[in-house]
Amino acid sequence: MSEAIENRNGRALVGVVVSDKNDKTIVVRVETLVKHPLLKKYIRRRKKFTAHDPNNECKVGDKVKIIEFRPVSRNKRWHLVSILEKAV
């Protein structure tokens, strides 16, 4: 099923898992760099996304790729595509 998900159009983000306490759910923190309009300095912005992890394979600290998907629940609109790097 992950191959079908990878081929979908939509936003794909890379982030770090900060929580895996819920069943089949992970919380992923995504960091982006935004240029400040006045200071012309890059600022690190962080946002948390709740993603669906059907096999409960992610652990805290894993670097993962998530993709925008149909709503699974009230807060989950993202789906785990792959684990890029396992936590030590």
UniProtKB/Swiss-Prot annotation:
| A single GO BP | translation
GO CC terms of this entry = cytosolic small ribosomal subunit
GO MF, any single term: rRNA binding
Instruction: Give the keywords, sorted.
Output: Ribonucleoprotein, Ribosomal protein, RNA-binding, rRNA-binding
What CDD domains does UniProt report for this protein, alphabetically?
Answer: Ribosomal_uS17
Q: Which Pfam families match?
A: Ribosomal_S17
The organism's place on the tree of life at top rank: Bacteria
Identify the InterPro entries for this entry. Answer: NA-bd_OB-fold, Ribosomal_uS17, Ribosomal_uS17_bact/chlr, Ribosomal_uS17_CS
Describe its function. Answer: One of the primary rRNA binding proteins, it binds specifically to the 5'-end of 16S ribosomal RNA.
User: What is the protein's quaternary organization?
Assistant: Part of the 30S ribosomal subunit.
Q: Which family does it belong to?
A: Belongs to the universal ribosomal protein uS17 family.
Family matches, as HAMAP family: Ribosomal_uS17_B
Question: This protein is called what?
Answer: Small ribosomal subunit protein uS17
Q: Which organism is it from?
A: Oleidesulfovibrio alaskensis (strain ATCC BAA-1058 / DSM 17464 / G20)
